[in-house]
A protein has these predicted regions:
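Mid/C-terminal beta-alpha module of Rossmann-like enzyme folds, strongest
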Residues: 15-19, 216-278, 291-332
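N-terminal Rossmann NAD(P)H-binding glycine-rich loop of SDR-like oxidoreductase domains
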Residues: 23-47
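SDR active-site strand-loop-helix element
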Residues: 28, 52, 97-98, 128-134, ...
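Residues forming the Rossmann-fold NAD(P)(H) cofactor-binding site
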Residues: 36, 110, 149
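Conserved glycine-rich Rossmann-like NAD(P)H-binding loop of the short-chain dehydrogenase/reductase
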Residues: 47-57
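NAD(P)H-binding glycine-rich loop region in Rossmannoid oxidoreductase-like domains
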Residues: 56-115, 119-122, 134-138
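Conserved beta-loop-beta element that borders a ligand/cofactor-binding pocket
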Residues: 132, 152-180
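A conserved pocket-lining segment of Rossmann-fold NAD(P)-dependent short-chain dehydrogenase/reductase
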Residues: 183-208, 212-216, 220-229
Length: 332
C-alpha cells in the first residue's frame, strides 16, 4: 500500500472514530463470522455495542475486546418481534447480520429482516444496515436467493433509508468457505471433485465488508437508501480457486472438474447427512457471484478491497503438511 493510501486510511479512521464515539449500535447476530469484525471496528471507533442473538453467550468472547461497560449482550431472535423491539430500543444504529444457510429461510431471511426493519423504524433508529448477499432476487429459483430478495424488499418497505450491502463470498481466518476446501485438500482424499468449476466468484475480505458497514453507519448521507455490492479485487472461477488453495498449502491432489450432469445428480441427494451440496446450493451455483456492472461498491464507501493472496496464506499455513516449515509453490 502506498504512503498516500495509508494516510488516507488513517484520516478516514480518525474521522469515523470522531463520529461513532459513544454511539449505541445494536448488532443483530453480532457474534457471527462477519459480526465479530463489525464489532471490532466499532469498538475501536469508541462506539457502545449491544450484541443481540439467540444465545448471547456465543458472543462473550467480545468482552475481552471492549472497555468496561462498552458492550452489552441480550437474547433476541429475529423470528420473535418482541425480542427485536427490546434489542433496538434506544439504539442510534442497527446492523442486521442474520442469515441462514439451512432451515427456515423464509422465517429468518424474509420475515426476520422485516421484523428488524419495522422495529428499527418504530424505535426511531437513525441508521439501519441490512446485510444481504449478491444474488438476492425475489425471483431466484433458489430459496436462499429468493428469501434474501424478499428480505431486501421488506426492509425497503419498512425503512426506506436503510443501507443494504450485498457481499460476495467472504473470506477470513474463521470462514467456512476457503477453510472448508483447504481442509478437504489437506485430507487423505486422493481426488478432489469440483462442482461448477467455471462459476465465477469475487471473494471479498470480511474485514473490508465490516469496514464498509461501519462507514455506512458513520456517514448516512452517503449510504442511506442505497444498495452496495461488495466484492474483492479479483474474479476467479471455482476451479481456479481450488487450485490456488492447493498451491497455497503445498498440496498436489488430483482435482477433477465434474460435469453438470453429475453435479445435478449429487445435489438431489443433498438431504442426506454429510452430503457435499444441497439442491438449493446447486441452484445458487448456476449464477456467477460477482458485482453487477454499475453497482455501488466498496470504493463508494471509501474501502480499498484486499486481495485474497495478501492475507489468506497467513492462516492457511495450518493446512500445510509441516506447517510453517513446508516449502510451497507461490500461490499466484
Amino acid at each position: 500500500m502506498s504512503t498516500r493510501a495509508r494516510r488516507g486510511k488513517a484520516a478516514a479512521r480518525q474521522w469515523t472514530e470522531g463520529v461513532m464515539k459513544d454511539k449505541l449500535v445494536t448488532l443483530i447476530g453480532g457474534g457471527g463470522f462477519l459480526g465479530r469484525y463489525v464489532a471490532q471496528h466499532l469498538l475501536a471507533a469508541g462506539a457502545r455495542l449491544r450484541i443481540a442473538q439467540r444465545d448471547p453467550r456465543g458472543a462473550y468472547f467480545l468482552k475481552t475486546q471492549s472497555g468496561l461497560g462498552q458492550t452489552q449482550f441480550v437474547a433476541a431472535d429475529v423470528r420473535r418481534p418482541e425480542t427485536i423491539a427490546r434489542a433496538v430500543a434506544g439504539a442510534d444504529a442497527v446492523v442486521n447480520l442474520v442469515g441462514a444457510l439451512k432451515g427456515d429461510f423464509a422465517a429468518i431471511q424474509a420475515g426476520g429482516a422485516r421484523h428488524v426493519a419495522e422495529a428499527s423504524a418504530r424505535a426511531g433508529v437513525a441508521a439501519l444496515v441490512h446485510v444481504s448477499a449478491i444474488g438476492a432476487d425475489a425471483e431466484s429459483p433458489s430459496r436462499y436467493g429468493r428469501t434474501k430478495g424478499e428480505g431486501e424488499a421488506a426492509v425497503r418497505a419498512a425503512f426506506p433509508e436503510a443501507t443494504i450491502v450485498r457481499p460476495s463470498i467472504m473470506f477470513g481466518r474463521e470462514d467456512g468457505f476457503i477453510n472448508r476446501f483447504a481442509a478437504m485438500i489437506a485430507s487423505p482424499l486422493p481426488v478432489i471433485p469440483v462442482l461448477r468449476a467455471t462459476e465465477k466468484f469475487q471473494p471479498v475480505f470480511v474485514g473490508d465488508v465490516a469496514a464498509a458497514i461501519v462507514a455506512a453507519i458513520a456517514d448516512p448521507d452517503k449510504a442511506a437508501g442505497r444498495t452496495f455490492e461488495l466484492g474483492g479485487p479479483d474474479i476467479v472461477t471455482m476451479g481456479a480457486l481450488i487450485r490456488w488453495i492447493a498451491r497455497a498449502i503445498g498440496r498436489t491432489p488430483a482435482i477433477i472438474e465434474l460435469p453438470d450432469l453429475i453435479g445435478g445428480l449429487i445435489s438431489w441427494g443433498g438431504f442426506l447427512p454429510g452430503a457435499p451440496i444441497t439442491r438449493d446450493q446447486w441452484l445458487m451455483l448456476q449464477v456467477d457471484n460477482v458485482v453487477a456492472p454499475g453497482a455501488a461498491t466498496l470504493g463508494d464507501l471509501g474501502v480499498t478491497p484486499t486481495p485474497l493472496d495478501t492475507v489468506a496464506p497467513g492462516w492457511l499455513v495450518q493446512y500445510r503438511r509441516h506447517g510453517r516449515f513446508t516449502t510451497t509453490t507461490a500461490a499466484a
